[in-house]
Structure formats: structure tokens, C-alpha cells
């Protein structure tokens, strides 16, 4: 029984050591790959599309507002057959930005009173 227990501890130790070595090798490979990608990276920042402008050609390049990114929303106007897509801010995000702005102002007042 003691032999089986010692053999099991030996196997667990050996397995943990070998897996740690493999993880170190993977981490080094990931770092090298990341560095090569950073070196090859080109400037790819495009101009963002302002709110209420057409975004049908690129739905992921809407501009950011103060806190959140605008969303490309598509709809059919009344009596029209063509789909229109524009960058818009969803109402719930608009209300969240207003609440955050009021909280900032209130925090500034409290800081002024006690600071």
C-alpha cells in the first residue's frame, strides 16, 4: 500500500513538472508571436461615422459618444422599399449617459462642500 501511495505521489509530481514546462514553452511562443504581430501592424484607424450619417457600407465604424459607442441601426422609412442604416445611440444608453453626467455634477458639488 505504501508503495502504491509513493508511486502515485511520484507520478503526480512528474506530471505537474512536465505540464509546467509545456506551459512555459507555450507562453514564450505566444510572446514571440505577439511581438512579431505588433511589428507588422499598420495604422488601420479609419474615420468614424458621425451620428445620423449613413453606415450601410461599414456597420462597425460608428463614432463613440462620451461613454458608449453608437450603433448602426437599419430601418425602412414610411412608404419606402430601400433600407436605410444610420449611426444612432440607443435610448437606454442615452439615459445612462445623462444619469452619469448628473452623478458627476453631483459628485463635484459634494467635493466642493466637503473638500
Swiss-Prot record:
Q: Where in the cell is it found?
A: Secreted
Instruction: Give UniProt keywords alphabetically.
Output: Disulfide bond, Knottin, Secreted, Signal, Toxin
Q: Which InterPro entries match?
A: Spider_toxin_CSTX_knottin, Spider_toxin_CSTX_Knottin_CS
Give the source's domain of life in one word: Eukaryota
Any GO molecular function: toxin activity
Gene Ontology cellular component annotations, sorted alphabetically: extracellular region
S-S bonds: 48-63, 55-72, 62-87, 74-85
* Organs and tissues of expression: Expressed by the venom gland.
Q: May I ask which residue range the UniProt record assigns to the signal sequence? A: 1-20
Q: Does the keyword Disulfide bond apply?
A: yes
- Removed propeptide positions: 21-44
| Domain text | The presence of a 'disulfide through disulfide knot' structurally defines this protein as a knottin.
Question: According to its UniProt record, which protein family does this protein belong to?
Answer: Belongs to the neurotoxin 19 (CSTX) family. 01 subfamily.
Name of the protein this chain belongs to: U3-lycotoxin-Ls1i
Origin organism is Lycosa singoriensis
Amino acid at each position: 500500500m505504501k508503495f502504491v501511495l509513493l508511486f502515485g505521489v511520484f507520478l503526480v509530481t512528474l506530471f505537474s513538472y512536465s505540464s509546467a514546462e509545456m506551459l512555459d514553452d507555450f507562453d514564450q511562443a505566444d510572446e514571440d508571436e505577439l511581438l512579431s504581430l505588433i511589428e507588422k501592424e499598420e495604422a488601420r484607424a479609419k474615420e468614424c461615422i458621425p451620428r445620423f450619417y449613413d453606415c450601410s457600407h461599414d456597420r462597425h465604424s460608428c463614432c463613440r459618444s462620451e461613454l458608449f459607442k453608437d450603433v448602426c441601426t437599419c430601418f425602412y422609412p414610411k412608404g419606402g422599399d430601400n433600407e436605410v442604416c444610420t449611426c444612432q445611440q440607443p435610448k437606454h444608453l442615452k439615459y445612462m449617459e445623462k444619469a452619469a453626467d448628473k452623478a458627476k455634477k453631483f459628485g463635484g458639488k459634494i467635493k466642493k462642500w466637503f473638500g
